[in-house]
Amino acid sequence: DNLFSPNFLDYVNQNLEIYKNDDSIFAINGYSFPLGLEMPQNALYKTFMYSPWGAGFWVRKYKAVSEIRFGDYFYSKKIMWQLFNKVPFLFDTVVSMEYSHVYYSDADYRVRMLLNNMYCITPAITKVRNCGYDGSGINCGNDDGKHASQIIDNNVFCGEMEEVEVSVGAIIAKYNELFEVSFIRKIKNIAKYVICLVRNS
């Protein structure tokens, strides 16, 4: 379902080398969510939103983040309350995971990165187009072409790219807008979380 830019591997390899000694960088994202950020086309920015739709990792950093256990944060009421207030769409997904006994690695790792002040390097223009949100598969519904119609970088080489600073607050606001959670759903999520806590007691 994923279409890759001709320069995807060039982009990933370049940035794996550039950021290898920066322990705050968890991965190099190829995919960039349609946030509507205003920045140059050759720009990079940091985000906690790891995307499994094409990414590059360092084994050392991946192992370090993987050592954090899901239960370490899920059963912390303080952490989950912060998540509910600041990033409700992540609270929604994480609660659904535990309540329904399913696992979404991308959501799990996004929370781990937020808790550890870690980020993924992400291109302004996506290097990956996901065509799987057309309602034809079993995992994703139809998003009215939002992902399948994304402009993709079709250059053969990625060239020199420049990191642009975007505040975590601004990034979170954009994602909350993209993945808006209704008030009723938020109430249902709190109820599900309480049920999960009772189950574990």
PLM feature spans:
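Peripheral/terminal regions associated with large enzymatic or DNA-binding modules
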Residues: 2-201
